[in-house]
Structure formats: structure tokens, C-alpha cells
Design a protein with these regions (language model features):
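Flexible "arm" and connector segments at domain edges
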Residues: 1-80, 84-147
């Protein structure tokens, strides 16, 4: 099943787009992405809440190891995959590859935390003290307004 093997982020994005319905306006498609991200993120948050705050705990794989209410890690992983799907199609709708999104994010984090994350660096972030990140984004504001 080599056609399902993912070697690079852009490879994943290309395969994920096979199931994306890109009909309608850009605004409508982005709304679909945002609602999908919200829904899938909510499912991850609910699983974590039940595992930690309701005392269900996590179980490896699908096996609950004596606790029938334990949250299977594989179920959480599936939801994280759904989030990745919506990030992928959202990036596509805005004209970006997943590779570009990943690079923009890594550059942002490197500028925000040049010495790595620390509580002090988080409190005194350099990227919010008048410095710009120097990242280059595509301007889709006109495209979004047209659709």
C-alpha cells in the first residue's frame, strides 16, 4: 500500500485533497475548515478532559487494561489526524503547502524563543515588543473579498 505511505508533508497534503470538496466561495470553504478544526479540536479536548479531570485515564492502543472508561490513545491520535487534515486543506485554500506552513511556524518560534522555550522568554516575548517576525505571507485579502 505504498500509495498510502507519506514521505513528506506536501505528499500528505496532496493525498488529503483527494477527499476535499472545493466547491463554493473561498469564504465558505474557509468556514468549513474553521468549523472542522474547531470540531476536531473539541474532540481532542474532550478526550483529554475525561482522561485527566474525570479520572478515566488513558489506555495504550484500544485496550482499556481493566478500566472500561479509559480513553484509548489511538482514538486521540485519529482526532489529531483529522486536525491535520483540516490544517492541510486550509493551507491549500489559502495557497500554501504544508511545507510552507511548517517553515513559517518554525521561523516564528525561532524568532519568538531564540534560545528555546522558557517561562521568562514567554513572558518577555521579543516578537511582541515592536519587532516583526520578518515572515513573508501571501496577500489573499483581495481574493477573499471577491468570493
Amino acid at each position: 500500500m505504498d500509495e498510502l505511505r507519506i514521505n513528506e508533508l506536501n505528499d500528505y497534503q496532496e493525498k488529503a485533497l483527494r477527499t476535499w470538496k472545493s466547491a463554493g466561495s473561498l469564504e465558505s470553504r474557509l468556514q468549513n475548515v474553521a468549523l472542522g478544526l474547531s470540531g476536531e479540536s473539541g474532540e481532542v479536548a474532550d478526550a483529554v478532559k475525561k482522561a485527566i479531570h474525570h479520572g478515566h485515564g488513558f489506555s495504550q492502543g484500544y485496550i482499556t487494561a481493566g478500566n472500561p472508561k479509559a480513553i484509548p490513545v489511538k482514538e486521540v491520535i485519529k482526532e489529531l489526524g483529522d486536525i491535520m487534515y483540516y490544517v492541510s486543506v486550509g493551507a491549500h485554500e489559502l495557497g500554501y503547502t504544508l511545507q510552507e506552513i511548517a517553515e513559517i511556524n518554525i521561523n516564528k518560534l525561532a524568532k519568538r524563543y531564540p534560545e528555546g522555550f522558557s517561562v521568562e522568554a514567554s513572558i518577555n516575548r521579543v516578537d511582541v515588543q515592536g519587532e516583526t517576525l520578518g515572515l513573508h505571507y501571501k496577500d489573499y485579502s483581495k481574493e477573499i473579498r471577491k468570493n
